[in-house]
Amino acid sequence: MIQRILFIILLCLCSTSAFAQMEEALAPLDYALDSAETRQLRLEVDNMTFFKDNEFSGTVMKGCTLPGLWVTPKLTYQPLRNLKIEAGIHALIYSGAYRFPNYAYHDIAQWKGNQYQRGAHLLPWFRAQLTLRRVHLVLGDLHGAMKHRLAQPLYDPELMLTADPEFGFQLIADTRPAHIDAWVNWESFIFEGDTHQEAFVVGLSSRFRLNSEQSRWHVYLPVQGTIQHRGGEQDKGGSVQTLCNGAAGVGLRWNVGHKVVRYIGAEALALGCAQQKGKLWPFSGGSGLYAKVDVGFKYGLSARLGYFRANQFITLLGSPYFGAVSTKHDGACYPDHPQTAHLALDYSRTFGKHYALGAKVETFCNAPGRMRLADGTMQNTTTTFNTSFGIYLRINPSFLLKQF
């Protein structure tokens, strides 16, 4: 009863999803091509320097500290008004790390024997983008990570600091009634006789607008999903795995127009997951509920508190606090409707077109219920308060080298 009262109090006090302002500053939707850059050769440097500290307790997941940066210097050339080509190198660096595991990063990488790179985790970077009116086709490195605008139970923003850039194919359609982002992210390629599995993620993030975003009361319908497939024709050993996440709901945004409060928004999502093939998850399927309310203030301040409840729901790319399995204890899960109340306060500020600063404090009040261990035994758990703090500096300067 105490846990239920605590959740209700937290939800009523601050139910906000104000990460929107910080998203706009640190991960802007900058996929539109600029016709003024036609036939220009430019040097661009895309960088984020960060310090993030996760102080987590309990049985769900481990805490960690991420001090570092990633940087992508690249040459860009736009031969046509609607065609842009970019090529460069992506480097991920953590302070105090001098050797980096040499394989694909889907999260914080695990050490892998003598297969490593020195100084940084390096990857080639290439993107070709073609724009046809309101449709953008992308091959190579995608407009990914937080730019997909996936709900937090489906995508953990921390992956922007730990995972490799997404690579594959992407289609973005931005029309008056809808914004649609569909993509394939190829995570792992296998050669003949390889010992690991082929893996890729198919994703959809869409928002259907029932009226104009500038309306005083804006109503929209979000529909999102991710599917991960593991195994392929070259894979002779491991079993095929197909795992799915989905979300659909309704959102409301009140554009207040006050000198202090910019907007207040609310969103409710029904969540679902399914294990179509394989036995990687302890449950074959599940569902969940996620509700949030947004408040955006002047001067780049915003706040959020959301509420999550799971019924055997397992997240593919989201934080374990939005799911029913433990990443701290192998094979452990939570069959008794785990719940999480999430409060976030953030600040963001842009400096001109190419520079942005962000800071964020989060608290997760997690009540997972009983934990079922890998051997089938049940173990009681307690409600925990877990905090996270991060500060981020994003720079993306562009230098004209030659006009053809």
Feature-to-residue mapping (PLM):
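Sec-dependent N-terminal signal peptides
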Residues: 2-14
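Sec/Tat signal peptide C-region and signal peptidase I cleavage site
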Residues: 16-20
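Cleaved targeting-peptide boundary
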Residues: 21-29
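Exposed, low-structure sequence patches enriched in small/polar residues
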Residues: 22-23, 46-50, 68, 125, ...
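Transmembrane beta-strand segments of Gram-negative outer membrane beta-barrel proteins
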Residues: 29-54, 85
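Surface-exposed strand-loop-strand hairpins of Gram-negative outer-membrane beta-barrel proteins
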Residues: 48-70, 100, 114
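Surface-exposed loop and membrane-interface regions of Gram-negative outer-membrane beta-barrel proteins
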Residues: 83-130, 152-153, 318
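Surface-exposed coil loops of outer-membrane beta-barrel proteins
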Residues: 136-207
